[in-house]
Curated annotation (Swiss-Prot):
Record keywords, A-Z: Coiled coil, Cytoplasm, Nucleus
GO cellular component: cytoplasm; nuclear speck; THO complex part of transcription export complex
InterPro entries (alphabetical): THOC7/Mft1
Full protein name: THO complex subunit 7 homolog
Protein's UniProt keywords contain Cytoplasm: yes
Ranges for region Disordered: 193-215
Family: Belongs to the THOC7 family.
Record has S-adenosyl-L-methionine as a keyword: no
Residue runs in coiled coils: 88-191
Major site of localization recorded for this protein: cytoplasm
Function field: May act as component of the THO subcomplex of the TREX complex which is thought to couple mRNA transcription, processing and nuclear export, and which specifically associates with spliced mRNA and not with unspliced pre-mRNA.
Originating species: Dictyostelium discoideum (Social amoeba)
Pfam families linked to this entry: THOC7
Subcellular location: Cytoplasm; Nucleus; Nucleus speckle
């Protein structure tokens, strides 16, 4: 969660900083073209019509570049925000699942301990019962022994089932932890990609500013 929060804050800071720098640069460039356009329209130069057409074309192109750059920046920002929110929601979901698994494992451990004690009591009772009835047992005694043996078998089966379920939940819990680790690893790998996308956008804007103007 801390990593996701930091990623979101860094992304917002980087976006707004780049947006301010880009906005100032583009506005200055467009304004410069606009001033040149105004100077030509108010001048008495014989070639003013040719210059006016050329500057008008350049000004339109600058506005086109501005619109395209803004669309690119907006698309990148929306994509990064959507991905960050997705990973944040996925991480919260995994944390909830892990907490639920922990609670279920704790309950299963308590159940297993209780059943082990019950089995121990039954075994002690059966051993004592057999010791008391060392002589040939009557029909009633045999029924009691058979009943106690049946209860012992049921407790043994239930204990085995609980043990198997506990092992399964433990494996599922370990899988959830592994999934969360993979999620954090993917986030770590996505940070350079986001920063690289922002750097590429800045480089593209810089290249446009260095392009010679048509005369």
């Amino acid at each position: 969660m801390k990593l996701i929060k930091k990623l979101l804050e860094d992304e917002e800071d980087s976006f707004f900083k780049n947006k301010i720098v880009f906005k100032n640069f583009v506005i200055k460039k467009v304004f410069k073209k606009y001033l040149q356009f105004i100077n030509v329209t108010t001048g008495n130069n014989e070639n003013s019509s040719v210059d006016l057409q050329s500057l008008c074309t350049q000004l339109i192109n600058e506005f086109g570049h501005l619109e395209l750059s803004v669309q690119k920046a907006q698309t990148i920002s929306e994509t990064c925000t959507d991905e960050t929110l997705y990973y944040q929601q996925l991480s919260k979901q995994r944390e909830i699942e892990i907490e639920n698994e922990k609670k279920e494992i704790a309950i299963l451990k308590e159940t297993l301990d209780y059943e082990k004690k019950q089995r121990q009591y039954k075994e002690q009772y059966l051993a004592l019962y057999k010791a008391i009835n060392e002589k040939p047992s009557t029909e009633q005694t045999e029924k009691e022994i058979e009943k106690a043996q049946k209860e012992l078998n049921e407790i043994t089966d239930q204990t085995n089932k609980t043990t198997s379920k506990l092992e399964l939940r433990t494996k599922q819990f370990q899988l959830l932890l592994h999934t969360l680790n993979e999620l954090e690893k993917n986030l770590d790998e996505s940070i350079p990609f986001i920063e690289n996308s922002n750097n590429n956008n800045n480089n593209s804007n810089s290249d446009q500013s260095n392009t010679p103007m048509e005369s």
